[in-house]
Amino acid sequence: MAQVGINLVRFAPDRDSPLGLLAPGPTSRRIDPALLDRLDYFVKCLKDQGIYVRLDLMHYRMFRPGDGVDCLMSQTNASGHVYCGGPALFFQPRATEIYREFAAELLRHTNPYTKLRYVDDPALATFGMVNETSIFSGGLTETGRRTLDGLFQDWLKTHPGKERDRFLSETEQRWYESTKAYLRQLGVKAPIACTNITYGTPNGQLQALVGDQIENNRYWDSPHRDWRWFWERPMLKERGGVYRSMARAAVAGKPFLVTEFNLNDNQYRSEAQLLTLAYASLQDWDGILWWDYHNSYTAGSGFDKFMGTTGGNGELFSIRDNPMMMAQFGLASLAFRRGYISPARTAIDVTYADVFSATARDRGQGRRGSSPDSPFEALPLMCRVRSRYDGASSPRADLLIQLGGAPGAGAGDPHRLVLETPAPGAAVDELRTWRAVRERMQQLDLPAISAPGDTTFRSDTGQLAWDTKEGVLTIDSSKLQAAVGFVGQKRLQLADFTIDFASDPAGAAQPTFAAISLCSLDGLPLKQSARILLTAIGRAEDTGEIREQGPEGDFAFIGGLAPTLVEPVRGRIVWQGRKLRAFPLTAAGERMTAITPDAEGDGQVLTIGGDGTTWYELVPDLGT
């Protein structure tokens, strides 16, 4: 794990054994000492390799009848996934009591292999209070619903005429404040986050006010319909993909960590690493946790229907054995940590006249997305964009966009742009916000962004260009240059290299979809680097793998067996200037027989794809 650049691992230990710490029995309150010992030793091993740990304190826990908590006892029900007891966690004292009991027992426990309590170990870099749960999410028993309704009626006596959302928000915020204070009393020193999905602007605001950092979970093409079917859509053909919703979740002045992310196992998965690297770097996010490295779901767990249990890379969420993911993981990690792609030059914050308004819900932190004229639709592909909430301090942005407000609000401040609420029933002009922001940026002499309606989104740094019509991303920085997507029959000119699939090398078939990158390994610009990693990966699948097309145009994945088959990416890499040699690399990173590129005019050309590898090491040719 450390060799490929992993430096943070997330654990969710509060699940039933053998997959978690909770021992069998009528209650979920007993920790299995043997399983705790395994966790302790794994934490020690990670620490030895310089890998930090993120610990969830409430994630998979399913309360049991003996716990005395009035909540749904099953993870899956008609309302979807109910983790942590669902909304009941935030208003049932018994649920809070059990939560704190588990936290105290785990965090004050001394790891025998490190000789440190978890509250004292600096390797535990961050904690999450709750996973994917809010009082705004579904999943209550009928008696639980009546209890919550009664609490709301009591609240109305002192808050007449106020919305139910305000009551829910206040209730949840009080829980997070008291729970965070309790964890500090236990001795937790690391940053603490609330949850990792934003359930609308009220929930986003309370996370900003209470949490030390903001977190978000997000997936592309996640299985649906019995957790077996997915759409086989390339994100590169969709404007912004999931990075728009991630940008909505990020908050000005707060660290931002993506605690779950994946592009699931469709044939376009090779786009995942470089796309994510590009826009996490542009947005200046602080970390990406892929879910997951390798899962331990087993037959009969309910998840084996779509995870696969036959070997190969059949688990949809796992990346460990998937060449489309792991062939690029190391370079993406290195480039992210070293800052090979620059953060955006322009910082834009989005604030809300009223976080409880329909405007905030529809054009800002909507639970399931936002309207086409939201500032988060196109701007995150070109500038740095954050949400901003009253009461949460943050540095001044280049431009503050306020959603909603009285006509004329913000007049006299060129750095504040107020977007008034459209009239009810009015047609939505999806370019309205984009147009207004671009005009204001021009007035402020900020870096130019793409014109409204363009299908190619260029970052204000000039390093990224995402052509959503063609489905191609190019990265063009001094230390990393790449092309991702539908590159077949295209010649893509970058600053130091040309990635050429328009010329047919030796009559070989061209790839339809691939990711090709050249990354400096020694930290020098590619023009001077003595070690350049060339990576080329297209499709990969297991032997015998089946994708069954469904009646809705979606697909079901049926895992195959080892060995995994990798499509050769046949093309040409062209450059001018100094002479380089190329070493194809084995799967272990060892050099094979050197290749001398061909001369072409004043430059050289390396034909790739016939060497049985996804990696080449380019080094100066010292023999000339």
Question: Model-found features: residue ranges?
Answer:
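Flexible internal linker/loop segments at domain or repeat junctions
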Residues: S222-E232, R547-D554
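Surface-exposed loop/edge segments in extracytoplasmic proteins
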Residues: G589-T596
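Catalytic-core region of carbohydrate-active enzymes that cleave or remodel glycosidic bonds
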Residues: L46, W175-P191, Y199-D221, F230-S394
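Active-site mouth of glycoside hydrolases
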Residues: M1-G211
